[in-house]
């Protein structure tokens, strides 16, 4: 039952984050859809860590380096997702209010992604690795 509550909480968090992103794009005072490019970062952010989890063996000394590289790449993707709306706002492609909404959405979405890996990342019967 705890897994179902976690799954519902994570889906609610994802919906709230996407709502902030859409508000930053679709409100009539902003009406620019450039911030939707951060969706690519949402898709790309878990990929390095997922690949590293599949490839490494915890007993191998190289596994630590592979995991650290995956965390480094994930960090670069997350920082880029936060930097892109700021660059758009500085270049006057979007308004600063839209930038604030997108950054709020980024925070919620990445917290949801982190929560997914914390809840479903263990090696038990209720793990995402079996999907």
Curated annotation (Swiss-Prot):
Main location: membrane
Membrane topology: Multi-pass membrane protein
GO molecular function: identical protein binding
Gene Ontology cellular-component annotations: endosome; membrane
SS bonds (residue pairs): none
Keywords: Membrane, Transmembrane, Transmembrane helix
InterPro entries: Vps55/LEPROT (IPR007262)
Subcellular location: Membrane
Pfam family, one: Vps55
Gene Ontology biological process terms from the UniProt entry: late endosome to vacuole transport via multivesicular body sorting pathway; negative regulation of growth hormone receptor signaling pathway
Tissue specificity comment: Widely expressed, with highest expression in heart, testis, adrenal gland, thymus, and spleen, and lowest expression in lung and skeletal muscle.
Transmembrane parts of this sequence: 7-27, 32-52, 69-89, 100-120
Subunit details: Interacts with RAB13.
Family note: Belongs to the OB-RGRP/VPS55 family.
Main function: Negatively regulates growth hormone (GH) receptor cell surface expression in liver. May play a role in liver resistance to GH during periods of reduced nutrient availability.
Protein name as annotated: Leptin receptor overlapping transcript-like 1
Designated gene of the protein: LEPROTL1
